[in-house]
């Protein structure tokens, strides 16, 4: 049998076996070409799951008339000029095979116009030798490619296509992935002349989380933790869901190119296994930016995998970038029971670390913090504390009217109506508004100073007497003032939301008391079988989260009837080491500058007999 050169159409059909697997493959190649052309608007029209029609329209740079013939030829591309370019690929496409391969297994027409041309032109290939025909056509700036009757001339390939619904689901998933790779591009997807997806361009980086919510779901955007690490030629940023979250969104990108790379997935899986022992990966959207010269994208027919020149370095970088977010969380929480922690001394050098970590620094994906932190809105299937009103659904507590409503609200002037209802249940105010100024003046005249000794212990003088006390006895009143000013105590966000499994009855019990927890600084998402803890009061941040929730559940069963009872409960469960933390030091400075703190401390203070100790010196 003699060796012969294959006809152009047959050669292209063989090449199409690698490039064109199904309609989604066609959409991928054509949309990537649009992105490479600088398009900011892309319209994707699908009919019958891509079996009948695939049409891609864009407003990109377009193709000049004299280049249309080359555009449908094999090994013709505008993205590579030399071997050096192959080692520094910044575009999504580069092989110059897609259009020729697609046109060999379908009826393809290419219409395009550059902004410098007065007229648009249309090209199509036909016949045994795939001769390209060009003719004028009416068309705006940009390019439109129509692919009709895919695999019409290869019956064996067409027979293996799935149902229209299945094929379109693959296209839909592909467009979701592309939408998260380019926030600055508007993308519209229609099926059988009905708009299915519409992603508007997000030119402001702070709006990126809105597209993440649109693609990955509202729960992902609310619960996802933003990650950012690295600098220079290797950076990582994105979002990761907590372990155990029911979300199948698992997208990875390398230089904005969609990836399903084994090395990347292995590093992510290993990070979660080492920290939490989780066998199943949570949802994530992770972007890796690397010097193009350090990665080979020409190792997979569909470009789904890459080869890093320093694979071990990249693997360890991804591993550590994720662990640096999760490990600090594990380190801050201990497994000691809640009651034991309250009596445990804490080293002065062991201070609470910032919950935001180091991953928010840097320039990559520099979104405002307010857009990245978990929001208070209600997530799908659960209640987010801080978002539901006191009289809302879900068994939330409803306060009963009280005769002292006006007096109480006069004192708590800054408290919202939702929170003020709790004070109507008999919350006692130790110092009235009318007496406040007089007390401050009187105490200021009699007080010298408050001297902090260690771990909340203090010494102060009042009315020419010396006393020893502990700042914890002034905490409740200080928290009262914060609620008066802010509406609630400020919670501290966990580095990674923690899931605590509970029975349905316990979840309902916690939901019934949710407005109290908002006042204290908790933020919980309550599901039917578990509670997701997103924030804890600053004074309880160092506790084991599971034990804290269990103790909170016990308090719900009591139940505590007013705000003072809840604040007293919180003070009793504040661990000793909190008084050595940076969080408390800031609160302590404010308390020391408040003249009323003296009166609060005197409730639980020991008088120091100076003369007795002076006699010891003689």
Curated annotation (Swiss-Prot):
CDD domains: HATPase_MutL-MLH-PMS-like, MutL_Trans_MutL. The keyword DNA damage applies. GO terms for molecular function: ATP binding; ATP hydrolysis activity; ATP-dependent DNA damage sensor activity; mismatched DNA binding. GO terms for cellular component: mismatch repair complex. Keywords: DNA damage, DNA repair. Residues 348-359 have a biased composition (Polar residues). InterPro entries: DNA_mismatch_repair_CS (IPR014762), DNA_mismatch_repair_MutL (IPR020667), DNA_mismatch_S5_2-like (IPR013507), HATPase_C_sf (IPR036890), MutL/Mlh/PMS (IPR002099), MutL/Mlh/Pms-like (IPR038973), MutL_C (IPR014790), MutL_C_regsub (IPR042121). Residues 377-388 have a biased composition (Low complexity). Residues 348-400 are annotated as: Disordered. Gene3D superfamilies: 3.30.230.10, Histidine kinase-like ATPase, C-terminal domain (3.30.565.10), MutL, C-terminal domain, regulatory subdomain (3.30.1370.100). One of its GO terms (biological process) is mismatch repair. NCBIfam families: mutl, PRK00095.1-1. Belongs to the DNA mismatch repair MutL/HexB family. This protein is involved in the repair of mismatches in DNA. It is required for dam-dependent methyl-directed DNA mismatch repair. May act as a 'molecular matchmaker', a protein that promotes the formation of a stable complex between two or more DNA-binding proteins in an ATP-dependent manner without itself being part of a final effector complex. This is DNA mismatch repair protein MutL.
